[in-house]
Amino acid sequence: MPELPEVTTTVSGLQKVLPGMTISGLWTDLAKKDQAIKQFKRTIKDEKFFLNFKKKVIGQKIIKVSRRAKNILIDISGEYTILIHLKMTGHLLFGDYYKEKETGKWLPRGNKALADPFNRFVHLVFTLEDKKKNKKFLVFSDARKFGKVTLFRSKEISLIKDLKDLGPEPLEESFTFKVFKDRLALKPRGKIKTVLMNQNIIAGIGNIYSDEMLWQSGINPNSICAKIPDRKLKLLWEAMRQILSKSIILGGDSTSDYRNIKGEKGNFQKHH
């Protein structure tokens, strides 16, 4: 699953190319007419929601792309925000695409990296236009189709279930060692790895980076939080900030499916 560094890499790439572009079209093969799964009801996997989503976003201009934990937030005109969670195998791609008539598949044009086999699972396509009406495409590739795409009024961000209970961002200057200890103290009997991956305790960390930072600081993943000495916790806090920052510089980890918006692999997996 893409974690903080991968989502940051994606957001940084999108922020360079999306603002100012207008959404002129939308396609998906995920929407179901009688969506029975409750967790998909307010996402594009529900046909009724998707049609409303489409109505609200087409014609709107993209203002800004940002991140909160593992969530990608795309602010658009009309005072709405698109929320995308990549889940297990999702990643966003940007470039030139066309829909093949014979197969109905969306295929990249020109960019070899976009033709990477891991980028072929296209299930959502935003058609975009710049001021000169030149078209580009924002594509969501997701092999396992677990990704989440929804929409909310921007002013209601503090009420959104996916966002309102998230813990602090570990790379913010305000995330001091004291704050780190205070967050762990909320789960004193929890196993440290489990607590690190709890998004309500600290935002953005998952399996890959919790393993890396625990290994570097010499802490057993099954250690109980309250029993870890401050000396070790300080090493863990330092490792957390160092490893996450390093992975962002390297473009994230592509041991599995993750690719950046150009369809390229990150390089963190080569350095650990």
Please give the residue ranges for each predicted region:
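Acidic, proline/glycine-enriched N-terminal capping motif
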Residues: M1-I157
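Short histidine-centered catalytic/ligand-binding loop motif
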Residues: G110-A115, D162-L171, S223-D230
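Short, mixed-charge, low-aromatic patches
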Residues: P5, N134-S141, D165-E172, K191-Q199
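Basic, nucleic-acid-binding surfaces and adjacent catalytic neighborhoods in DNA/RNA-processing proteins
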Residues: T22-K56, S66, V179-H272
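Flexible, active-site-adjacent loop/turn segments at secondary-structure boundaries
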Residues: P2, I63, L86, G90-L92, ...
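Generic detection of long, well-ordered alpha-helical segments
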Residues: M1-L4, D116, P170, S174, ...
